[in-house]
Amino acid sequence: MPNPGSTSSPGSIPEEIRNLLADVETFVADTLKGENLSKKAKEKRDSLIKKIKDVKSVYPQEFQDKGDAEEGDEYDDPFAGPPDTISLASERYDKDDDGPSDGNQFPPIAAQDLSFVIKAGYLEKRRKDHSFLGFEWQKRWCALSKTVFYYYGSDKDKQQKGEFAIEGYDVRMNNTLRKDAKKDCCFEICAPDKRIYQFTAASPKDAEEWVQQLKFILQDMGSDVIPEDEDEKGDLYDDVDHPVPVSSPQRSQPIDDEIYEELPEEEEDTASVKMDEQGKGSRDSVQHPSGDKSTDYANFYQGLWDCTGSLSDELSFKRGDVIYILSKEYNRYGWWVGEMQGAIGLVPKAYLMEMYDI
């Protein structure tokens, strides 16, 4: 009779036990990693992890090294049975494309070292559990940095668990991902023939904010230059593109030669004065839309996040900086014209919040 404690010739482990051990390892090593545990709980967690590793070392043929892959997202369980209906329907959500992987396209970076973070916070990320437990949501600290979506175990991690460039993707709310109280907190980032990423936010409002910020960046990526409406362009630059016509004495007849007689130089001077007055009036109307800037509280805004202008006509500002809005004529494109410390330029309205509650 074989000795249960012997490790010289270990037998095979039943599939149910392997799956259960994989579930326990995922829960202890990954799920509890981002939780605030007591000292005693942490010691117990470390002890369980060590025991699991010992078992896997005794039965190396039963377990394959999954490396640093992201909790089952980046590999297939070699011990999983034939895929059921749920697995087949969800395969596209949980495995990478046949081409290059979405992950590991960017160098490792600590969560605290990310720059130009537009939106960040804890989300539940959906993954495929390669066992009888089916799907599972795991807590992840996510950050949208420029055009890359990063996800970490926590905001203290020194390296991301995964990331993907959002270019080519679309984002939308999806209340069919869950059947519990969080069903209205779900959204997904998807694209044809690409892996789908699904998340659950803390509240419906937080989920909508993620969707809005992602949509704003995706729309902004579609055009490097802000389009101009021809009518608006004509109205704004009417005094430059269409100068006041100067009549020539050779081509027109004076109304009354005896009363009105102007030399060409005088007509040109008069036209120049009119153009200067019109230009000055236009500038005054733009810089002071409400008359008195000092009391025009409705047009004072402050930065929600740091923003670095990529073009010369864009303002750069930091979170909390005060910006006075001169014009909202590009509102349809998500941009306003603002002034900060004497500098005037375009500012993304999504990066601003009202300074005064009027």
Curated annotation (Swiss-Prot):
Q: Where is the composition biased (Basic and acidic residues)?
A: 274-293
InterPro entries, per the entry:
PH-like_dom_sf (IPR011993), PH_domain (IPR001849), SH3-like_dom_sf (IPR036028), SH3_domain (IPR001452), SKAP_fam (IPR037781)
- Keywords attached to this entry: B-cell activation, Cytoplasm, Phosphoprotein, SH3 domain
**Chain intervals with Acidic residues compositional bias:** 255-270
**What GO terms describe the biological role, i.e. biological process, of this protein?**
B cell activation; negative regulation of cell population proliferation
Q: Where in the cell is it found?
A: Cytoplasm
GO cellular component terms given for this protein: cytoplasm; plasma membrane
Q: Write down the SMART domains for this protein, in alphabetical order.
A: PH, SH3
Q: Which domain of life is it from?
A: Eukaryota
The answer to whether keyword Nucleotidyltransferase applies is no
What is any Pfam family matched here? Answer: SH3_1
Spans annotated as Disordered: 60-108, 227-293
**Ranges annotated as biased composition (Low complexity):** 243-253
Where is the PTM Phosphoserine found along the chain?
6, 9, 87, 90, 223, 272, 282, 285
Swiss-Prot/TrEMBL domain comment? The SH3 domain interacts with FYB1 and PTK2B.
Q: Which family does it belong to?
A: Belongs to the SKAP family.
Q: What is this protein called?
A: Src kinase-associated phosphoprotein 2
